[in-house]
Amino acid sequence: MSGSMSSVFSLLYLLSVCSACYISNCPIGGKRAVQDLPSRQCMSCGPGDRGRCFGPSICCGEGLGCLLGSPETLRCQEEDFLPSPCEAGGKMCGYEGRCAAPGVCCDSEGCSMDQSCVNGDATAFGQPDLLLKLLHLSNHAHPYRLHQ
């Protein structure tokens, strides 16, 4: 009987140790201490630092779209080592995400299509760039057109 009691106590001890914070960027004072710190804007990333980090491997920005797991997102991994939490731009969407690009909602885990990110602030995503993108696409027309 004493062997089973020591096994139970060992299991309870392991459970108490396992309830520790597993996230590499847990703040001093535990998870609840985050509520006391003011949020800041997330780090810039991507080509020319035109984007903002939305997660450890997610970089989104105006006219850039979203980059996932590319070399441009490596800087976003540094965000895990900063003591204060950050808040990416855009309005709230999804479960805990924010609008990252037109029609795209991102959180720290990934991105998904979201209609609530299409409507609303047209200036937040640079609508004037749409004309430039269309002009850019028209320049890539096939050079050998058949004339009838």
Swiss-Prot record:
Protein's UniProt keywords contain Disulfide bond: yes
GO molecular function, one term: neurohypophyseal hormone activity
Keywords, alphabetical: Amidation, Cleavage on pair of basic residues, Disulfide bond, Hormone, Signal
Segment forming the signal sequence: 1-20
Record's GO cellular component terms: extracellular space; secretory granule
Role of this protein: Isotocin causes contraction of smooth muscles.
Family: Belongs to the vasopressin/oxytocin family.
UniProt protein name: Isotocin-neurophysin IT 2
